[in-house]
Amino acid sequence: MVKKHKFYTKEDLLCSSRGELFGKYGPQLPAPNMLMIDRLVKVTENGGNYNKGFIKAELDINPNMWFFSCHFIGDPVMPGCLGLDAMWQLVGFYLGWLGGKGKGRALGVREVKFSGQILPTSKIVVYYIHFRRIINRKLFMGMADGEVFCDGKIIYTANDLKVGLFQDITSFKKDFK
């Protein structure tokens, strides 16, 4: 049984990346450098825009982060796909927090909009994930909308983020059809 906390530290998230937080068969977060979250400051089963679950998480930005040196040389900016991946990471984390088992896989997103950027001079990124639906059948799946704020300004939105937990990833395509 997963012990549900209302917040999680960086060390807790690193435990998740090692497969220690949700147990041997629970989903994992990626390890650094792909872990795009420093802490979860709020996790609830209710709340959010649809009253079906909510996460607020944060990432501290510093100019030495790995992607600034290569994306782009002379014009450093955090790749937008990393912010999108962070939202998928959070949906998968939530499925583990609910007690789901399996390996998490992003299954898509209906719409993503970018209206700002994360620069080396930025200080903090805040993610808001509003759960629309949790499906627990053959496939355990979460559907959510997300917002990304940088230094208090909304810069990305994503509608219908989807993440599923798979017992056997060799059947990934078959299970999703």
Curated annotation (Swiss-Prot):
- Sum up the protein's function in the record's words: Necessary for the introduction of cis unsaturation into fatty acids. Catalyzes the dehydration of (3R)-3-hydroxydecanoyl-ACP to E-(2)-decenoyl-ACP and then its isomerization to Z-(3)-decenoyl-ACP. Can catalyze the dehydratase reaction for beta-hydroxyacyl-ACPs with saturated chain lengths up to 16:0, being most active on intermediate chain length.
Q: Which UniProt keywords apply?
A: Cytoplasm, Fatty acid biosynthesis, Fatty acid metabolism, Isomerase, Lipid biosynthesis, Lipid metabolism, Lyase
Assign the protein's first listed, main location to one coarse class: cytoplasm
Q: Which Pfam families match?
A: FabA (PF07977)
Q: In which pathway does it act?
A: Lipid metabolism; fatty acid biosynthesis
Q: Which gene encodes it?
A: fabA
Q: What EC numbers are recorded for this enzyme?
A: 4.2.1.59, 5.3.3.14
Q: Which HAMAP family match?
A: FabA (MF_00405)
Residue positions of the active site: H71
The protein here is known as: 3-hydroxydecanoyl-[acyl-carrier-protein] dehydratase
Hey, which family's this protein in?
Belongs to the thioester dehydratase family. FabA subfamily.
